Each structure stands twice: as structure tokens, then as C-alpha cells.
Regions:
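Long, acidic/polar, low-complexity amphipathic helices and coiled-coil-like
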Residues: 85-190
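Secretory targeting and sorting signals
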Residues: 1-29
Length: 343
């Protein structure tokens, strides 16, 4: 990387000695994000005059070349248009730019339309959508899940999902899906989120990586709802999503405890670090059930690889097992996929 930068600086210095800034940009091929943005604005003025306005630009990953330029849409407060352009090559996503921009504008408008269907469905039953991640990803809503409220809140969100499915239309990907998912964060976490600027288009604010990061750095829940022929099982089920360090600590606690219990039957037992989805027990947020994998005997290197044995365990929020564990054998197809029984 350092050598590459030195070569770029040597090339730039040669150009400066040879001539003007124009020579630096065009003859030497050193095109900045500023030039990419200017080229994108000229493209927009030509093909969508007065309809879209550039509001930001970022350099794409080093080595790919070009920049991503972001546009607001004049007649749609929610829509955002993203164009990846390489002014040096005169291409957008490696293609002819006019067509790519046209597709980007259409996509931005369609995503805004889909967002409004989602927003209205959840607004109608009292839940605000505060983040989306990437377009089409599970939305984030706010609710306080406690033992006293979890079933009611999950059912309420499930009612929103049913409205969302119905409003999306029978031929929509959502209506044809087997399930839908909603992320649930607490009011305290939502209050501290990175909100961005109100002047930004809605789809720009709600899909930003730093917004999602400000939510997911805290423990939250993901609710799932089965869909059959457009009808949603509104009761739903929820699982716990923990930040990495908390997940590791939880996993170590439950694995250590289960290992000790298994040693009564398998003195040489070896646990894997694998953790299955930890689903909340019905009506509880302080009880969650999931699978751990183990080997009754280690391999010749002292490891547990391609385990065919699992244990189903219910634990408290800290990872301490509660109640009896259940051992399940033959959970893997040969050395391939797991086939853990549902629970």
C-alpha cells in the first residue's frame, strides 16, 4: 500500500512539473471524488434536469476506482439515488452511465414507495420504524420487552406485519415469503441512536451504517413471523441478538456449565464453540433456549469436529442453565449440514 502511494505521488509530481492541474487530472489519470461528483452532477443535469440534486459523495474501496454519489429527489422527500461513477473511465458500475443513472433513479423511487408501505403499516398499529439497514432488510422498531409485555408486544408487531403483507400486494416478494423478520430495540437504545440530519432523504437516514451500528452495539431482539399464503402467524417468536463480547461471555458461561453436567455421562466430553439461535421462551425475556454441540470423545488432536451430538438447553440471560438439559444424537448428515430438531 505504501509503495502504491509513493508511485501515485511520483506520477502526480511528474504531471505537475509537466504542466497544469488539467494534466494532473486527465493526462495522469488521478481523478478525485470531487471530479467524480462533478461528472455525476453533469450527467444528472443532462438526463434529469431539476429532478435530482447531488448531496454527498464518498470514495469507493481503494482499488475499485470511482466514487458513490448520492442524490436527493426533488419531488420525493423519502427517496435517495446512489450512483457509482468512475469519471476517469467514463463508466458507472462498469457500464454506460446514462442507463445506469436511469435505473438508479427508478430504484430509488421504488425503494421509497416500498418504505412508505412499510411505514404506514407500522404507524397504523403504533410502532415507529426507526431504521432499515439495507433496503429490503428487516426493519427496526421500538418496544420494551419484559416478561409482562413480551407476548403482547410481539403480537402487536405481528399485526403490523400482517398489515404490511396485505398492503404490499399478493404478488409481492413479501407476501410470497415464508417468514418476515422485525428487529426490536428498547426505548433507551432508540433514544441514543445516531439519527443523522433531518435534511437528508428518509431512505438515506434510515439505511446508514452508523445508525445500524448505534443500535446493534446493544443487546436487542429479532422477531420472526411465519407467513402462509399471505397470512401471518402474528404470535411470532423472538431471539436474542447480542454484541460480540456479550455473546462470547454468554456462550462461555453456558458451555462451561453444560460441559460439567455432561461429564457425568461422558467423562472426556469436548464442547464446540458453536451456538445455535437462542430463542426466548414464550412469555419470558429472561429464559432462552438453544442448542450446543459436543463430542463424547475428542479426536486424535483433542478437538471436537463435525459433531453429531447436541444438547438443548434453556438458560437465563447470563447463560446459566435452568432446568434439565436434553441430549439429541444424529444431528448431522454425514460430515455436512446440521439437522437440529425444531424447538
Amino acid at each position: 500500500m505504501a509503495g502504491s502511494r509513493r508511485r501515485q505521488w511520483r506520477a502526480a509530481a511528474t504531471c505537475v512539473l509537466a504542466g497544469s492541474l488539467v494534466a494532473l487530472v486527465s493526462a495522469c489519470g488521478v481523478v478525485t471524488t470531487k471530479e467524480d461528483r462533478r461528472a455525476a452532477e453533469e450527467l444528472a443535469d443532462k438526463h434529469f434536469p431539476g429532478q435530482i440534486k447531488a448531496i454527498g459523495a464518498r470514495t469507493l474501496f481503494p482499488g475499485t476506482g470511482g466514487s458513490e454519489v448520492t442524490f436527493a429527489v426533488a419531488d420525493d422527500r423519502d427517496a435517495v439515488v446512489r450512483l457509482r461513477i468512475n469519471a476517469e473511465k467514463g463508466t458507472c458500475d462498469g457500464k454506460e452511465c446514462a442507463g445506469v443513472l436511469k435505473e438508479a433513479v427508478a430504484r430509488g423511487r421504488a425503494e421509497a414507495d416500498a418504505y412508505r408501505i412499510l411505514r404506514d403499516a407500522f404507524d397504523a398499529c403504533g410502532y415507529e420504524v426507526i431504521a432499515l439497514g439495507s433496503p429490503g432488510a428487516a426493519p427496526y422498531v421500538v418496544a420494551e420487552l419484559t416478561n409482562a409485555t413480551v407476548q403482547r408486544e410481539l403480537a402487536g408487531i405481528g399485526g403490523c406485519v400482517q398489515r404490511w403483507v396485505a398492503a404490499s400486494g399478493a404478488d409481492s416478494p413479501l407476501a410470497k415469503a415464508k417468514a418476515s423478520y422485525v428487529n426490536v430495540v428498547s426505548p433507551a437504545v432508540a433514544e441514543k441512536r445516531n439519527r443523522g440530519k433531518e435534511s437528508w432523504p428518509t431512505m438515506m437516514r434510515l439505511t446508514r451504517g452508523n445508525l445500524i451500528a448505534s443500535l446493534t452495539k446493544h443487546t436487542h431482539h429479532a422477531a420472526s413471523y411465519d407467513i402462509v399464503d399471505g397470512q401471518v402467524d402474528t404470535a411470532g417468536r423472538a431471539r436474542v441478538i447480542r454484541p460480540f463480547k456479550e455473546s462470547q461471555a454468554f456462550g462461555k458461561t453456558v458451555q462451561d456449565a453444560v460441559r460439567e453436567e455432561l461429564r457425568a455421562t461422558y467423562p472426556n466430553v469436548v464442547m464446540t464453540t458453536y451456538q445455535w439461535v437462542w430463542r426466548l421462551e414464550p412469555g419470558r425475556v429472561d429464559r432462552q433456549t438453544g442448542y450446543l454441540l459436543f463430542c463424547p470423545e475428542p479426536d486424535e488432536r483433542g478437538r471436537c469436529v463435525n459433531s453429531d451430538d447436541a444438547v438443548l438447553v434453556t438458560a437465563d440471560e447470563h447463560g446459566n442453565p435452568v432446568g434439565q438439559i436434553r441430549i439429541v444424537h444424529d444431528v448431522r448428515e454425514g460430515t455436512g449440514a446440521l439437522r437440529l430438531p425444531p424447538y
